[in-house]
Swiss-Prot record:
Function recorded in the entry: Binds directly to 16S ribosomal RNA.
Family (UniProt): Belongs to the bacterial ribosomal protein bS20 family.
Protein name: Small ribosomal subunit protein bS20
Gene Ontology CC entries for this record: cytosol; small ribosomal subunit
Region (Disordered): 1-31, 69-88
Bias (Basic and acidic residues) ranges: 1-11
Domain of life: Bacteria
Cross-referenced NCBIfam families: S20
Source lineage: Bacteria, Pseudomonadati, Spirochaetota, Spirochaetia, Leptospirales
């Protein structure tokens, strides 16, 4: 355990951030699974609304540096390709 007050505060801050980050990462994975499930079930309307929510979550995650912005762009692009190929 840290002996310095600022170090103790840093540990508390890190725990808080870690909890928030893991929650947001989990939310991203869950949303991706929901979109893929809707695509698999050929439910185009639901897949589209879920995809819009997913892209929003990705953009927010990129904005807060949870994931890199290019990583978010790549995930959006690949999911859009899957969505478009299922529509055809």
């Amino acid at each position: 355990m840290a002996n310095i007050k600022s170090s103790e505060k840093d540990i508390r801050r890190t725990k808080r951030r870690n909890a928030a980050n893991s929650q947001n990462r989990s939310r991203l994975r869950t949303q991706a699974k929901k979109v893929l499930k809707a695509i698999k079930e050929k439910d185009q309307k639901a897949a589209m609304t879920l995809f819009i929510e997913y892209t929003s979550l990705l953009d927010k995650a990129a904005k807060t540096n949870l994931i890199h912005s290019k990583n978010a762009d790549r995930k959006k692009s690949r999911m859009a390709k899957r969505l478009n190929s299922s529509a055809a």
